[in-house]
Swiss-Prot record:
The family this protein is said to belong to: Belongs to the universal ribosomal protein uS14 family.
Gene Ontology molecular functions: rRNA binding; structural constituent of ribosome
Any one Gene Ontology BP term: translation
UniProt cross-references to HAMAP family, sorted A to Z: Ribosomal_uS14_1
Assembly with partners or alone: Part of the 30S ribosomal subunit. Contacts proteins S3 and S10.
Keywords, ordered alphabetically: Ribonucleoprotein, Ribosomal protein, RNA-binding, rRNA-binding
Protein name: Small ribosomal subunit protein uS14A
Record's keyword annotation contains Ribosomal protein: yes
């Protein structure tokens, strides 16, 4: 599990991205790069690192499910992810 401070930082970054999304879009359309530079760095969505929604793990993230491979495997074995079942042939 990730440190609680890293999870909190990630959530704070997500809020900043949402807060400035409309303003960033407008400034980009105008071509006002000077004003874009004055916005907070963390308001840029490119700086976000995808993290597991359950425990905050940053590596082995599965975008389709919003979780890491470890949590995906555990939940899939328990049958808690709809439409996912263990393969057998």
């Amino acid at each position: 599990m990730a440190k609680k401070s890293k999870i909190a930082k990630f959530q704070k970054q997500q809020k900043l991205v949402e807060q400035y999304a409309e303003l960033r879009r407008e400034l980009k359309e105008k071509g006002d790069y000077e004003a874009l530079r004055k916005l907070p760095k963390d308001s840029n969505p490119n700086r976000l690192k995808n993290r597991d929604l359950i425990d905050g793990r940053p590596h082995a993230y599965m975008r389709k499910f919003g979780m890491s491979r470890i949590n995906f495997r555990n939940l899939a074995y328990k049958g808690q992810i709809p439409g996912i079942k263990k393969a057998s042939w």
